[in-house]
Amino acid sequence: MVGFIYAGQGSQRVGMGKDFYEEYPLFAKTYDNAPSYVKEYCFDGPAETLGQTRYTQPCMVAFAVGVTNLLKEEGIVPDYACGLSLGEYSALYTAGVFTEEEVIDLVAFRGAAMEEAVVGRTAKMAAVLMMDRETIEACCKEAQENVGDGLIVSVANYNCPGQIVISGDEKAVDEAVKLLQEKGARKVIPLAVSGPFHTSLMKPAGDKLAKKFEEINFGEPSVKVVYNKTATEIQDGETIQGLLEQQVQSSVYLEDSIRYMISKGVDTFIEIGPGKSVSKFVKKIDKDVKVMSIDSVADYKQVVSALKGGCNE
């Protein structure tokens, strides 16, 4: 069985999609129909502008949509799909929940809402390497108590064994890092992001998204989607809207999501980039599964050659 996994914010790079745009009219159509800045910032940057959340998100999703459309034209569709944070929206596009126009518009709105949620607040995210979940969670809780003043730090991403990301107010994150180092954390890497994503500080963005969702007719998923917040498929009583509203302000359980997909029989993962960071996480979770990534036309041709006829049609 095949699972598509979609990259999240941070994987963007100047030049992404240019080779696809020049070779495949179907891909070019996606970029041409997107807001004009998508093509401009994807192809020419500058990297600082492409890295602004309100622009990163529609640019990343336009790339993912374009590649997904090419795969679909080849008859390659997944049995399961999931995405890292922003990538969840691309997974839902793959499943037919959103149209191309809807998903690019929606993530542009999401990116702006996430930026606006923390205006005037100094935030930070950091990747903690080679430390167990329980210790990291305990240090975050202790750090919050130590700094007080309503400052927040919590786990944002459970990426893979040995890599967990914490997020929140800068002072609280710095305190958590100090506590983690005292507990023996080998390495803590600050991340170049523009907000305390996947914490309760993103509640204003979640509230705005909830209102925005009222304007959209959510389609019935044609592919099984595994959600960031729950690391499973949708359950009775849950809605996609509710899960997405919570996702922006809750921990992302990527490792658990990948393990769930493997437990359901997925043995081949295709990362739709740009970048190859999620593929590395998958290999750390289970070295026996097959993992391929699509960052370039050369990658795409290799994946099609390997999979043609091997997926659902």
Language-model-detected regions and their locations in the chain:
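FabD-like malonyl-/acyl-CoA
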Residues: 1-136, 268-300
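Alpha/beta catalytic cores of group-transfer enzymes, especially the acyltransferase/condensing modules
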Residues: 11, 36-39, 96-249
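Short, flexible loop segments at boundaries between secondary-structure elements
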Residues: 230, 290-311
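Glycine-rich phosphate/pyrophosphate-binding beta-alpha loops
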Residues: 56-58, 196, 251
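A short, acidic, amphipathic alpha-helical segment used as a generic capping/interface helix at domain edges
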Residues: 249-266
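Non-catalytic positions within long, well-ordered alpha-helices that form the structural scaffold/packing
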Residues: 72, 181, 262-263
